[in-house]
A protein has these predicted regions:
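C-terminal charged interaction modules
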Residues: 82-143
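Surface-exposed polar/charged interaction patches
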Residues: 44-47, 51-58, 79-82, 114, ...
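Short N-terminal mixed-charge amphipathic segments
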Residues: 1-58
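Short, surface-exposed loop/turn segments at secondary-structure junctions
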Residues: 52-63, 90-95
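Short amphipathic alpha-helical coiled-coil/interface segments
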Residues: 68-73
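Intrinsic disorder/low-structure terminal segments
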Residues: 5, 12, 22, 79, ...
Length: 143
């Protein structure tokens, strides 16, 4: 049987050397899930801050923090359809701060930057490639 192979745009990325994820950074379905997940996590971040400020008992705070950490890890793992959080964050809470932002935010912003960069690059490559094939097959067009 003959086999046809084509470029799907699927790219595998090593994330901080801890794990790998694969996605097509120009896939609108993935990008929509990425932005929806980011917005939901951002909303939960605001709720998290407000709730932690309300709680006074340390044990209640820690229980709440663990619950929210697990919830957010599930959302991030769901975005990539594979468990990535344990490898990326280990025992660190995803609300931990690094470079002024929660670590979950740093991770998703890095993915968003890759999406933006790749999309711009692919857009530039698309028009010349289409023109090349249009010219190639133009000679077969009936007049």
């Amino acid at each position: 049987m003959k086999e046809l192979n084509f470029e799907s745009g699927l790219v595998t990325y090593s994330i901080n050397g801890a794990c790998e994820v694969s996605f097509n950074p120009t896939d609108s379905n993935f990008v929509e899930r990425l932005y929806s997940t980011f917005e939901e996590l951002d909303r939960k971040q605001d709720e998290y801050k407000a709730q932690v400020e309300k709680l006074s008992d340390k044990r209640e705070i820690f229980d709440y923090v663990h619950e929210r950490d697990a919830e957010m890890r599930g959302m991030i793992d769901g975005l990539f359809a594979t468990p990535v959080c344990d490898a990326l964050f280990g025992n660190m809470n995803v609300y931990a701060i690094a470079n002024g932002l929660p670590v979950w935010c740093n991770f998703l912003l890095a993915v968003m930057d890759e999406v933006d960069t790749t999309f711009a690059k692919e857009q530039k490559a698309t028009n010349p490639r289409i023109a090349k094939y249009t010219a190639k097959y133009q000679k077969y067009r009936r007049k």
